[in-house]
Amino acid sequence: MQLGEIKKNIHVIGSLSLNKKFIKDSKLELQKFLNIDDLSNFCILTFNPVTNEQNSGIEDLKALLNTLKNIKQKTLITFSNFDKNSTDFLNVMKSFDKKTDTFYLRNNLGIDKYFSILSLADYMIGNSSSGIIEAGSFKLPVINIGSRQEGRIRGANVVDIKMLTPDNIHKAIKKVQSK
């Protein structure tokens, strides 16, 4: 409804990217593919630069990674997209990945593997449209951070955090883990 569409003419039918038939990989296959010994009790983090703000979100990314590190949350981190400042984001992610034994930074997973991972994760955290669009199809709770997805219709699986603080992250994690 961002462009003035009439609400009664909009029919939410799901994500077009989910129309592609895929075979779900087993947990064991994914562990081998990702080189992770135990793929349980984990979240998936996808955090992209915010291109329409002066602050690209790099400080938010650092705060988020610090909070997840401090609570020892096993986290599969996917590379950010290729927007402006994505190289800076990747460098921060690599730095945390090297210092934290509960972080697993991975490049392009491919759509089939990505969907399989969404089906196994406990929750997703970040600012990716994937959390708004695809995650609900897997009944995956999502913590959506910041303004990047403002204006998008979202499901009940999404918890929004506007102000990124450790306390807000903790509260949101408790909320999605109780779903």
Residue ranges: model-predicted function:
Residues M1-K179:
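Nucleotide-activated sugar donor-binding and catalytic core shared by glycosyltransferases
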